[in-house]
Amino acid sequence: LVTTFITDEELWACTQCNACVQECPVNINPASLILDMRRYQVMEESKAPTGLNTVFQNIENNGAPWQFSQDDRMLWAEDLNVPLMSDGKNPDYLFWIGSAGAFDDRYKKVTREFIKILNHVGIDYAVLGTEESDSGDVARRSGNEMLFQMQAMMNVEILNGYDVKNIITCDPHDFNTIKNEYPDFGGNYNVYHHSQFLQELIDNGKINLDGKEFADKKITFHDPCYLGRGNGEYDAPRSVLDAMPVKNVEMKRNKSFSLCCGAGGGQMFKEAEKGDKEVFMERTEEAISTGCDIIATACPFCMVMMTDGLKYKNKDEEIKNYDIAELVSASLNI
């Protein structure tokens, strides 16, 4: 099919956002078909965009899409005194950091702020530390099914070895993978995206957000594809924002009709195909048009793309991009 009916450019431009699946009037799953074709190219023809081949090698060698050492996976936690599963405790929750949360400079700040919230509330948690490895999401969406399954089986073995029951993560991609795909490999857990966990803390009265720092600010929330369309969670992040004295404004395309940031499906790690406009620029312009002061995100990939978009539009001084964990932490003054 590829090159005959579908070009390589079309095949690899897909962000796996699943908007086509939602809109298809005859219930065809185009995203799944695209993924099958990517698998054929990668597994049978050893063919993939250059950037993705590098990602595959990095995950296989280092347990992350970037060329960082596995031993550096806890550098983000310097001076935070974060408990480890290997300490021998059996906590209520495992906080799954994810590769972006451990290595991406911008999202490491989000990881630290969420840890501060957990400590502030007194949540019984621990992390895997250097035992954690990439979830395999990027490998699977990019067609490298063998690498994904290797990562999944390895992670499930470690998680089950610690008898983990409840997992929290800030990454919607890892949230989706661990919740919906790890059960196929014997990994059955209660998995929470951090927006859901924060909403639960607010609903139970464990945190109260005065949000004075953001009083009367206009905030627009960008729905991550794998939190929203992928798992039907639209209310939790908005409920968290509603707990602050801010004015929430919606983008034209929101919730189930939200536009992808453009980073999913491996796009984060490769050059974009030629076109009139990159997806992240379209989404950034849509956010800017709301007149917002802050773009709230809840995904490391979305964070990168929206931040880059604001810089390209020379709006990064006027409009800020924060993860909801950062907004909550600032509201708690911790």
Describe each PLM feature range.
Residues G101-N190, Y226-I334:
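Cofactor-cradling patches in redox/metallo enzymes
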Residues Y189-F197:
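Short, conserved active-site entrance elements at the starts or edges of catalytic domains
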Residues L1-Y182, G186, L201:
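Iron-sulfur-cluster electron-transfer modules
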Residues L1-Q16, A215, H222, G275, ...:
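Ferredoxin-like iron-sulfur electron-transfer modules
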Residues L201-K217, G262-M268, S331-I334:
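Short, surface-exposed amphipathic charged segments that create phosphate/polyanion-binding patches used
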Residues N90, A215-K217, C292:
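Phosphate-coordination loops involved in phosphoryl transfer and adenosine-cofactor binding
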Residues D203-L241:
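C-terminal amphipathic alpha-helical segment
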